[in-house]
Amino acid sequence: MTRIKRGYIARRRRTKMHFFASSFRGAHSRLTRTMTQQEKRALVSAHRDRDRQKRDFRRLWITRINAVIRERGVSYSYSKFIHDLYKNQLLLNRKILAQIAISNRKCLDMISNEIV
């Protein structure tokens, strides 16, 4: 019988995995089995947090807009402001409004005065 030498495919797969997990701490960057488990876990977390990031930024934008709008008066709120925007067909999204609220509050006051 001739001797069959192992191929390079498994080694290539482990090398790729090691490159991915090289920044992990302890055994998670050295042992193959724990490396695979941590790689799966990291990818699951990344996938979940990409969706969560969208929610978190939307909440942040709404909070920033609301904080600046409420300085005008107690009776005026974020929901009334957004309602007035839609009523007057001003197409500004929350991200842009939040940037305006931080960088130039007077501009946001002008927008809110125009739509009221």
From Swiss-Prot:
Q: Does the keyword Transcription regulation apply?
A: no
Q: Describe the function of this protein.
A: Binds directly to 23S ribosomal RNA and is necessary for the in vitro assembly process of the 50S ribosomal subunit. It is not involved in the protein synthesizing functions of that subunit.
Q: Which GO biological process entries does UniProt record here?
A: ribosomal large subunit assembly; translation
List the GO terms this entry assigns under cellular component, sorted alphabetically.
chloroplast; ribonucleoprotein complex; ribosome
Which is an annotated GO molecular function term of this record?
A: rRNA binding
What family does this chain come from, according to its entry?
Belongs to the bacterial ribosomal protein bL20 family.
Q: Does the keyword Ribonucleoprotein apply?
A: yes
User: Where is the protein found, in the record's own terms?
Assistant: Plastid, Chloroplast
Q: Write the gene name.
A: rpl20
Q: Which HAMAP family match?
A: Ribosomal_bL20 (MF_00382)
Name of the protein = Large ribosomal subunit protein bL20c
Alphabetized, the UniProt keywords read: Chloroplast, Plastid, Ribonucleoprotein, Ribosomal protein, RNA-binding, rRNA-binding
Where does it primarily localize? plastid
Q: Which domain of life is it from?
A: Eukaryota
Q: Upper lineage ranks? A: Eukaryota, Viridiplantae, Streptophyta, Embryophyta, Tracheophyta
